Amino acid sequence: MAAEIILRLERIGRAYKEADRELIILNDADFTLRRGEMVALVAPSGAGKSTLLHTAGLLERPDSGDVVLDGRSCSKLSDDERTAVRRNDVGFVYQFHHLLPEFSALENVMLPQMIRGLSRKAAAERAQQLLEYMKIGKRASHRPAELSGGEQQRVAIARAVANAPLVLLADEPTGNLDPTTSSYVFGALEALVRQSGLAALIATHNHELARRMDRRVTLKDGRVVDL
């Protein structure tokens, strides 16, 4: 029996104005992501990977079509409602970690939980658990500048899943790391996804990492197609 569909993109259209012409990025794009599934999004720069991720994660509104998250249509949600859904159900990881430099690793992972309303004590406990799982628990008190690139990215991953999202969207999460560190960080990410059962869509240029996922897709003529 197939796993439950967590994320569904239905005939997504997205275009941008460029000088005197319209640049079509997504054109009736369809895509489904199931619980516990890891999907690699492999496409050249400029193909629309970031646009697809931002649309799927409710950071951008599509010009047409619908994003359905856990059975809920998001096309008619207000900006505040989209923000609430994004905060509760979607985790983001980027190529650059975007950690807050003035806070420790532990505090960076605590913050999204406290914004959601968790107590400081409960947030600290979960943050420490996640850092331990990412094998960086002993560095919890260190600020980002005191961590290596791989350590910073593992903190960013822990932060992304701190609120137990349904979906993890990652845009080149290991793209700024050397091959050995990249493989190690991806292994930690993969273990976390498998253990938690969330669904993950990961954009990457790294074909070796892409082959470690459940399936691979690309963008062709504005549509999502299997590789």
Curated annotation (Swiss-Prot):
The species this protein belongs to is Brucella abortus (strain 2308)
Reported EC number(s) for this entry are 7.6.2.-
Decide whether keyword Membrane is in the record: yes
**Source superkingdom:** Bacteria
Report the top EC class in one word: translocase
Membrane topology category: Peripheral membrane protein
Protein name per Swiss-Prot or TrEMBL: Lipoprotein-releasing system ATP-binding protein LolD
Subcellular location field: Cell inner membrane
**Upper taxonomic classification of the species?**
Bacteria, Pseudomonadati, Pseudomonadota, Alphaproteobacteria, Hyphomicrobiales
A GO term from the CC aspect: plasma membrane
